[in-house]
Amino acid sequence: MTNSIRIGTRKSPLALIHTNLVIQQIKQFFPDINCEIVPIITSGDLIQNKPLYDIGGKALFLKEIEQALLDKKIDLAVHSLKDVPGRIPEPLVIAAVLEREDPRDVFVCLKYKSIEELPQNAVIGSSAVRRKAFIQKIRPDLKVTVFRGNVDSRIKKLMTGEVDATILAYTGLKRLEVFNPEYCHLIEYSQMLPCIGQGVIAVEIRKDDNAMLEICNQINHLPTFELIKPERAFLEYLDANCRTPIAAYSQYLDANPRHLSKLAYREVFEGNTEALATAAYKSNRTDVSTGLTYKLPLEVEFGKVSNIQTNFMLGNLDGSKITFHTETTNIKTSTEAGIKAAKMMLEAICK
């Protein structure tokens, strides 16, 4: 096991918060590992005066970080999963995610509590074509203007009257401790589906880095990891970019997704059974620090808490046509459900 890890991340305050949350998880399992944060300025951070769809999409927030990973200048990278394209360059992989935060969007406005309450021809600041499509579906009269920058800068623009309202992710507002219920109002899923992967912190590594893979196996939040599969499959199949209005949100239909799986042991083992069960549940592999022995691989059986419902949205390039679809599937076939939805909805949009 390595003694230190170089963690690549963007330099924004929110990205650094995300990175420290990952470090907290790593330290729980590997308290002696030294974690060095390597801040990286990305092209997406430098270009703030143009919408993302005009300059290469969200991948611009990853390009320099992924290159540092490929060049072995860093050992792992931390991203907001919503910024990660459906197709990841070889030999990189999303190997772990943290538990998902509430992925809803927030209507931010000083005078009004909802999009419906805004006066005729009001201006909403947003550069996301997904949000623009939903806004225009609810209120075609509203004007949507390009609105780039980090969370703090967008709120400052709102406060100075540059726009009448904006829409931001709840996760960022909460983690930056700037969610104010006086002018921040949660938007329900029925009105606006979130961005794919919204609310999820992702860890990217090189596939052949066994040391990082072992760490990721420990910190990975399995219920969230399974939950995002249909969303990501939908995104990957469509190879969607920032010009395409697209959204998806998955949730467990069962009451308690934390108790997602049970482990079936295939050989007699030695050691403290409680410690073994804990180690196996968290990583699905041996944990040499416990001194326990069991045959790998463990067979993972998904029980009743395994049904996922995913709501999908896809629009055409100008947002004039939007289609919705819902898939309910067993956890073992959730990826296929995302692909199925993509095929059906693409056909509907193209008609």
Curated annotation (Swiss-Prot):
Q: Any idea what this protein is called?
A: Porphobilinogen deaminase
* Required cofactor names: dipyrromethane
Its domain of life reads Bacteria
The family classification in the record reads: Belongs to the HMBS family.
Catalyzed chemical reaction(s): 4 porphobilinogen + H2O = hydroxymethylbilane + 4 NH4(+)
Cellular component terms per the entry's GO annotation: cytoplasm
The record's function comment reads: Tetrapolymerization of the monopyrrole PBG into the hydroxymethylbilane pre-uroporphyrinogen in several discrete steps.
Origin species: Rickettsia africae (strain ESF-5)
Pfam families on file: Porphobil_deam, Porphobil_deamC
How the cofactor is bound: the record states: Binds 1 dipyrromethane group covalently.
GO BP, one annotated term: protoporphyrinogen IX biosynthetic process
Pathway per the UniProt entry: Porphyrin-containing compound metabolism; protoporphyrin-IX biosynthesis; coproporphyrinogen-III from 5-aminolevulinate: step 2/4
Q: What else is known?
A: The porphobilinogen subunits are added to the dipyrromethane group.
Which keywords does UniProt give here? Porphyrin biosynthesis, Transferase
Question: Which GO MF terms are attached to this record?
Answer: hydroxymethylbilane synthase activity
- Known EC number: 2.5.1.61
Q: Which SUPFAM superfamilies does the entry mention?
A: Periplasmic binding protein-like II, Porphobilinogen deaminase (hydroxymethylbilane synthase), C-terminal domain
| Annotated positions of the S-(dipyrrolylmethanemethyl)cysteine modification | 242
Its assembly, as annotated, is: Monomer.
Q: Which Gene3D superfamilies match?
A: Periplasmic binding protein-like II, Porphobilinogen deaminase, C-terminal domain
